[in-house]
Every structure is written in C-alpha cells, then in structure tokens.
Amino acid sequence: MPSPRVLGLVLAGGAGRRLAPLTADRAKPAVPFGGLYRLIDFVLSNLVNAGYLRIAVLTQYKSHSLDRHITTTWRMSNLLGNYVTPVPAQQRLGPRWFAGSADAIHQSLNLVHDDNPDIVVVFGADHVYRMDPRQMVAQHLDSGAGVTVAGLRVPRAEGRSFGVIQTGRDGRIIEAFLEKPADPPGLPGSPEETFASMGNYVFSTDVLIDALRKDAADEDSRHDMGGDIIPMLVAQRAAAVYDFSDNVVPGTTARDRGYWRDVGTLDSYFDAQMDLCALDPVFNLYNREWPIFTSVPSLPPAKFVHDDPRRTGIAINSIVSNGVIVSGGTVRSAVLSPGVRINSWAEVDRAVVLDNAVVGRGAVVRDAILDKNVHVPPGAQVGVDKDRDRARGYTVSERGITVVGKGVTVTD
C-alpha cells in the first residue's frame, strides 16, 4: 500500500495570556524554551522527523517573531514540493480574523485544496514532547475512523483540567468528549486513569472539509476544534482515540517515553525548564535519533572566568547556551539563553534567563524568569522579596516565580 499524502496544519494563533508578560510582544508558540528553542520547534521537529514535509503554520496573535523564526529556521528544499510556511489570517471569507481554531482551518481550506492530501494532521504549537505521528496516522488508516484524537493517560483527578475522552469498552471508539469534567471517566482496564486530549488530530481529508463547512454554517458554534468539531464527529461515531503511551520514538528511554507537558502557565513553564537542569532530566534534549531542530545564532562558545577563588565563574546543574559569559558569578539550576552575561559576585539560582540579559556585579536573581534584554544593575535583587517585586510592577506567579518583562532595567 503506498504511503498516504499528508499535509500538516499547526495551530499557532494562541495569545498565551497566562504566560504574560512573556507573551506581551510574541505569540505563545514563539516563547523561548530550553536555552535555544522556541515552543513551536517541538511540534515541527516531530512532523519533520516523521518525514511530513508539507506544513502550514496558522498564525494570528502578535506573530512577527514567530513568522520570522519559521522563515529563517524551517527552510525546506522546494525541489520536491516541501515547505514549512507561516499562514496569517487573510480574511478570505470576509473582513474578519480567525474566530477560533476550526475557523482558522476553514478560512485556510485553500491550502488543503491546493495540496490535495489524503490525510490532514492538525497539531497544536505550544507543547513540549516527542512523538512519531506516523504511528498515529497508521492507526487512523487501519481503524477507518474519520478523525483520530491523541489521548494522554493522566490520573483521573488531573483530568478535571483537560478536555477528556470517554471511550467504549474497546478503548478506541470515542463515545463522549468532555470539557474539564468534575468526575472524569476511567479507562477500560485502568479505572484510575483517564484520557486527556493532547490537541493533536489526524483527519481523513473529506471528513475534515465536511465538518468545517457544517460548523461554519452554525451561528451558535464557537468554531473550536476541541469544543465543536470533535464532538460533532463523536456524535457520528466517526472519532477514535490514539493512546499516546503506545507511541515509540527512536532514541527515547523508558524514563522519557510518553513525556508531554503543557507549559501554558508561568509555573509549568518554569518547572519544565528546571527539569532540564536536573542530573537525570525526565525529558532528554540530547536524543540524536529524534532531534529537536532550531536555528542557532552565530555566537562564540560559552566562557567562564576568572581564575580567582574570590570570584570564579561557575555554573552548576545548568544549561548554558552559546555566547554566554559567566564572569566571576555563580549560576545554579538555571537555563541561560544565548548572549547572557553574568558578572562578578552575582548569584543566579533557579532561574530562566533569556537572550542578552545582563546580571550585574553582586546582583541576586532567584526563582525568577528574565525575558530578553533585561538588565539587572549591580547589587540589585530579583526574586528575593516577592512583595517588593510586585511593588516594582513585576509579575509574580501563583507559586512565587518573579517574571521581569522584555527589555526592562530592574530598579533597586
């Protein structure tokens, strides 16, 4: 049987308000992660590693940095018709922007018609994980379903925070799609677990087009993929679930197999990066068999100075990107993005420091996120006194992580 022709659609229009101020000037999928990456690099790497090389990224909210990242990083040879391209809202169906994730695809159906795929893979743009989507596509074709939804096994209590998939006894056909239920249903054979929707879908093309057109004609619809399109197909008994725990990615270990993180809040974003700093992190960035691709700035290697016991530049349990200079400061459990400068006697402990931020002499940064081009003057403190941080106008998360926005000079 010949391989199906697959088109990838990546939904990247989210505003990410819970990640503010990191999303004040950028779309959520463009938020930096892990030193070198953007959140969108994870889904695009999964698709490209699988050989799916015709991908449209549907953008809308403050998309300039996201569009620039895609066009400079994800350049495919077009000799064989391959592409990764950002597609902004174009008002093809009238003078309005995208009204929801389903409307974004409906307004972009010209892409589907032009490419004429057998299968349309619709994935979200802002989760951290590895997945081989070929295995999900294979199950979809074998099942004969109109749509297959990726399901993540989570404890039932955690299911209250997700869209939840209820299946029949066979564990495959979806009987109900529940939005943040108070009492999530257990799984057949595993009653203490439930299926949380990952927001990843595989559609037979004709089924997707038909569902989108019906949804567009419904004035009461929210035009949302998870809230409207999937329930419509569930009612037709045309929806199946794909168990993410069955997915085997080359190079993964038993420890990081099945890893998936929604980093949509400041605390979850921070926690996922602190995990990367651990001696044995759950998520392995160093898997060469299924790499996470990105563009790396042309900067020199990281440097640590001085050879002086009173101010030795040192980084412990940390990720240090190219262009970083740790000049006599101490860094513990931190992710330092390219071009960061840590000066003498400075202390950086449990922090995410984004591109070109500068921490001055004797300054302290603790339990904090510094966005790009932040300047912490000599002797200043961030994250030490949360009440003082709030008084200075900085965001403090529910769990006490201080966030300083892009380009801010910290006041003493």
Curated annotation (Swiss-Prot):
Question: What molecular function does GO assign, one term?
Answer: ATP binding
- So, what pathway does this thing act in? Glycan biosynthesis; glycogen biosynthesis
Q: Which reaction does it catalyse?
A: alpha-D-glucose 1-phosphate + ATP + H(+) = ADP-alpha-D-glucose + diphosphate
Q: Which PROSITE patterns match?
A: ADP_GLC_PYROPHOSPH_2 (PS00809), ADP_GLC_PYROPHOSPH_3 (PS00810)
> Which residues are recorded as binding alpha-D-glucose 1-phosphate?
163, 179-180, 197
Identify the keywords attached in UniProt to this record, alphabetized: ATP-binding, Carbohydrate metabolism, Glycogen biosynthesis, Glycogen metabolism, Nucleotide-binding, Nucleotidyltransferase, Transferase
Q: Which GO terms describe its biological process?
A: glycogen biosynthetic process
Q: Which CDD domains match?
A: ADP_Glucose_PP, LbH_G1P_AT_C
Keyword Nucleus recorded:
no
Assembly and binders: Homotetramer.
Q: What is the protein name stated in its UniProt record? A: Glucose-1-phosphate adenylyltransferase
Native source organism of the sequence: Frankia alni (strain DSM 45986 / CECT 9034 / ACN14a)
For this protein's source organism, the top of the classification is: Bacteria, Bacillati, Actinomycetota, Actinomycetes, Frankiales
